[in-house]
Amino acid sequence: MKKIAVLAGDGIGPEVMEQALKVLVAVQKKFGFELSFQHADVGGAAIDSHGVALPESTLTLCAESDAILFGSVGGPKWEHLPPAEQPERAALLPLRKHFDLFCNYRPARVFKSLTAACPLRADIIGDGFDILCVRELTSGIYFGTPKGREGAGEDEYAYDTMGYKRSEVRRIAHMAFAAARQRSGKVTSVDKANVLTTMVLWREVVLEVAKEYPDVKLNHIYVDNATMQLVRDPHQFDVMLCGNMFGDIISDEAAMLTGSMGLLASASLNTENFGLFEPAGGSAPDIAGQGIANPIAEILSAAMMLRYSLGYGEAADAIEAAVEKTLDRGICTADIAVDRSQAVNTAEMGDAIVAAL
């Protein structure tokens, strides 16, 4: 039996989590494995119940589990707190640090039935596309030292440091190539090796790792060209391997091509494939409690959990196929519906996906 730490959190988190668990219960029955769901508070809910966004009991539960299924955290209720104590910073960042979740998988898929929601022209979209951004999360310019500000007046100077160890590049490259093996077998490494010394090392190490995956095709692209090519011809990409800052930008650009944050799943993993799986969107407090949130991102995050942390790839495929089948039938929540008067609510979308399984 696999043990799942369920951290529903705040806002729409509990609503979409309920639907994801409904789908997981159905898929475990279908495929004959067993999951144990253990719930704990996190984020604003934990501040209210325990006084901190990440209680020790929640952290202990996560450490004793095989994976973490996360909802969302944050909301206006806790915005008066110092930034370091607010749910977003005080819950997610410590979880990532504690479990060394250095690898971020961000899929961006345009389903054939939802191509109208994509901002690109129909001739560019075709029947849709499926891109996986693999982003290094714990190093690079966001974490580099020294950083600071010196001087005064017009001579004031601010600086940051970008740097990567060979080992850090190697481990994220392995994650990208391993993911590509489960997909179409193609990696595009995004760098700026023409001007940045850090990226020269990045490219060298990626080339070394590529030799261990002769069945995976490797291309290199400069980040400025990558941002253009994503909107010019997204079909050329499958797995995009990026450093922290470039991945931050590229993954958000790719995400917006899908047409809705309610479709975007995310996984953060360590070298043991232990991971935290969550929707890429936020807690959406403006619609929380109304039963209209799109649960697909949480459901697809659960599918990623099955694939990458638990080893149930066939079950993950079944969930993703059920989501696509449901959308093909024209069943949509308000955020992706062409005719909002025909939109289903959160629970109805969950029920439809279970039925499609």
Curated annotation (Swiss-Prot):
The record marks Y142, K192 as: Important for catalysis. InterPro entries: IsoCit/isopropylmalate_DH_CS (IPR019818), IsoPropMal-DH-like_dom (IPR024084), Isopropylmalate_DH (IPR004429). GO terms for biological process: L-leucine biosynthetic process. SUPFAM superfamilies: Isocitrate/Isopropylmalate dehydrogenase-like. Binds 1 Mg(2+) or Mn(2+) ion per subunit. Its main location: cytoplasm. Mg(2+) binds at D224, D248, D252. Substrate binds at R96, R106, R135, D224. NAD(+) binds at residues 75-88, 282-294. One of its GO terms (cellular component) is cytosol. It is an enzyme of class 1 (oxidoreductase). Keywords: Amino-acid biosynthesis, Branched-chain amino acid biosynthesis, Cytoplasm, Leucine biosynthesis, Magnesium, Manganese, Metal-binding, NAD, Oxidoreductase. Pathway: Amino-acid biosynthesis; L-leucine biosynthesis; L-leucine from 3-methyl-2-oxobutanoate: step 3/4. Its EC number is 1.1.1.85. Signal peptide: none annotated. Its cofactor is Mg(2+); Mn(2+). GO terms for molecular function: 3-isopropylmalate dehydrogenase activity; magnesium ion binding; NAD binding. It is found in: Cytoplasm. It comes from the Bacteria. Belongs to the isocitrate and isopropylmalate dehydrogenases family. LeuB type 1 subfamily. Homodimer. PANTHER family: 3-ISOPROPYLMALATE DEHYDROGENASE. Catalyzes the oxidation of 3-carboxy-2-hydroxy-4-methylpentanoate (3-isopropylmalate) to 3-carboxy-4-methyl-2-oxopentanoate. The product decarboxylates to 4-methyl-2 oxopentanoate. This is 3-isopropylmalate dehydrogenase.
